Amino acid sequence: MTKKSFLKYLLIPTMTLVIAYPILSPLAQKSAEHQPAAHKVIAYYFHTNTRCSTCMKIEAYSKEAIEKGFPEEIKNGTLEMRVVNYERPENRHFMKDYKLVSKSLVLVNMVNGKQTDWTNLKLVWQLTGHKDAFLNYVRKEVRSYLAKG
């Protein structure tokens, strides 16, 4: 192998790396920015096609407890609130996943994108007539799940 051909093999990969780095670097940064949080809590409010006033109140109070109680956690992605109609075909698996028998607020603990445990906050039904107690109950349970991280 001549000195010239040796340099050709040595320089081409180096030049490719130098050229590709500025192009790939922002993509790598964006990819890292969109990685799921190592620990995350998802609060699901599950409802059906039929929505009574109590069910609507549970959803509204749940959103208020979470959105006003944990704005930083929502912003940084460690807490998320999802409202899901579990009667829709694509969501029916949730009935089995979380043993749903009625409208429910369920907290799910996620670690590295995998569910580790969950709990159904069953007291929300008894607390709908006591807004402050409802908000405190939900926030206490969410705090407990956030502390698992």
For each feature predicted by the language model, list its residue ranges.
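A short beta-strand-turn-helix
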Residues: 28-40
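Charged, often glycine-rich, active-site loop that binds/positions anionic groups
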Residues: 92-100
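Local sequence-structure signature of Cys/Sec-based thiol-disulfide redox active-site neighborhoods
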Residues: 37-68
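Thiol-based oxidoreductase modules, predominantly thioredoxin-like and allied folds used
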Residues: 74-90
